Amino acid sequence: VLDETFPIENGVIETYSDEECIVKKAEEFVGKLRAKCCGKCVFCREGLVQIHEGLKDLTAGKAKITDIDLMKELADIMRQQSNCSLGQTAAGMMLGLQEYFADDIKEHLAGRCHTLTCKALVHYYIDPKMCKGDGHCVENCPKKAIDGGKDFVGVIDEFECDKCGK
């Protein structure tokens, strides 16, 4: 209802708690802008694609510092050259993210997300001190991504695990 009353590109300030990942929220925000893009303005159309993909890479642990530099350069150009508010809004958001949340970006570049929101950056393991070696974890894993059994500490297969937390 709020998105219909107050479109996301109108300057309304959104607040987030410390438990929400600002990088993930930025990726979702740019995704919404990308979906609304009419495609007429080259800088908006192509810039939204590049920034959205860059933020997706960042939340997936695939981005490099050079990607962040490229997104900043692109955002600077988008702010000047976009003919509509969508491109200018995305540019402002990206520049603001880099200016005010640089630590969050660095954290994601290092493969961590302190909110545990970005699943690709969360790594599960079975604590040997807590494991009783009774196979309980093996039975409870819906993806059968845990190898173990009686008198063995379970080991999680990162490729099979969908990070459900069960």
Protein language model regions, located:
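Cys/His-rich microdomains that often coordinate metals
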Residues: 48, 138, 145
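Redox cofactor-anchoring modules in respiratory/redox and cofactor-processing assemblies
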Residues: 1-123
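The C-terminal cap of the DNA-recognition helix in HTH/winged-HTH DNA-binding domains
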Residues: 80, 142-143
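Ferredoxin-like iron-sulfur electron-transfer modules
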Residues: 29-35, 76, 113-133, 144-166
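Short cysteine clusters
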Residues: 38-44, 84, 131-137, 141, ...
